[in-house]
Amino acid sequence: MALISLAIDYKKSPIEVRSEFALSGLDVSMLYRSILAIDNVVHAVILSTCNRTEVYLEISDLIVVDDILVWWQGYVRNPNYKIKDYFKLRQGTEVIMHLMKLACGLESMVLGEPQILGQVKDSYTLSKKNHAIGKELDRVFQKVFATAKRVRSETRIGYCPVSVAFSAITLAKRQLDNISSKNVLIIGAGQTGELLFRHVTALAPKQIMLANRTIEKAQKITSVFRNASAHYLSELPQLIKKADIIIAAVNVLEYIVTCKYVGDKPRVFIDISIPQALDPKLGELEQNVYYCVDDINAVIEDNKDKRKYESSKAQKIIVKSLEEYLEKEKAIISNSAIKELFQKADGLVDLSLEKSLAKIRNGKDAEEIIKRFAYEIKKKVLHYPVVGMKEASKQGRSDCLVCMKRMFGLNVEK
């Protein structure tokens, strides 16, 4: 079994590309059923956020990569975008190292941001619910979560956390001097939407409106805040008329706010959704300001230097954690092989022993039978090693011969 990952992220792909290859907003159960139906795919975890879409897989043959790319390409709406031009393949230890760095926030657009860990955990949970995760992937993710917890407790990588949500609010503040007199509309009540809401409430705007597909979730978030209200997405046309700032963090497959919704009133539009939820043409209207996820980079760069030192400390913890994981995996593999070896030996001994005991009970010469039993066991136990040594000798594999000699305590010098 081999461990691989295929990824499209913000480092190599601009927002329009990430939007095309995003798997968020699709039926999760359907995604898992379809990917597990591919020959040589054994287990899978699918991660899709605003900055990346990654698929982690246990496979039985590397040839399956082409089939996975075909599967992924099938969800792309615009055929001009070819996944082979953008994806990155990782294998083995590289996958685990990347996932550890990712969960610790070291691969994020905002260095050290904590939201990604929750997103990785959510992806892991969904994989388990869909019976898509196996023992090896499960051990990998458990070690990743333990590593992220250790990094958070032993470094200050998340000190004064700066997230994409926080950076979005920073952009809004730059455009509007006095947010306390403004109405803010947040679209989406997921993890990022809730974080946006909490950042906005700290600025005490005139009114905060939170729109979501299910109003119960929006009501739960807004219920403890004054001047906050929950709404259905179907109310967007009316809500936009009231809003000065519109921020979207929602999973949709097409634009839910377009130019037909807005008049001459100046507004700030910030879209951190992938795929995009707000039509970029909104920014072409003279009175509007429009930002997407990639525009947040400038804000984020201001905060990177503060976290670089803590990042180096986190890297050391991750390297140590990876070493621990690999050592444990070696032990698991060797213990499994040892257990199988003993089971094989037990099977050989039990069959011959029962035959020998039956002969003794029938009055046969015990000494002769024991000698015969010992001879038969010797032949059976040494049969496969002898065959293996002969085969290694034919192939000129002196390294295999040396290894087998060591296994049986023989002189390797001869």
UniProtKB/Swiss-Prot annotation:
InterPro entries: 4pyrrol_synth_GluRdtase (IPR000343), 4pyrrol_synth_GluRdtase_dimer (IPR015896), 4pyrrol_synth_GluRdtase_N (IPR015895), GluRdtase_CS (IPR018214), GluRdtase_dimer_dom_sf (IPR036453), GluRdtase_N_sf (IPR036343), NAD(P)-bd_dom_sf (IPR036291), Shikm_DH/Glu-tRNA_Rdtase (IPR006151)
Residues annotated as the enzyme's active site: 50 (nucleophile)
One Gene Ontology molecular-function label: glutamyl-tRNA reductase activity
Keyword line: NADP, Oxidoreductase, Porphyrin biosynthesis
Enzyme nomenclature, EC number: 1.2.1.70
Metabolic or biological pathway, per its Swiss-Prot or TrEMBL entry: Porphyrin-containing compound metabolism; protoporphyrin-IX biosynthesis; 5-aminolevulinate from L-glutamyl-tRNA(Glu): step 1/2
Site (Important for activity): 98
NCBIfam families found in the cross-reference section: hemA, PRK13940.1
Function: Catalyzes the NADPH-dependent reduction of glutamyl-tRNA(Glu) to glutamate 1-semialdehyde (GSA).
Protein name per UniProt: Glutamyl-tRNA reductase
Native source organism of the sequence: Francisella tularensis subsp. holarctica (strain FTNF002-00 / FTA)
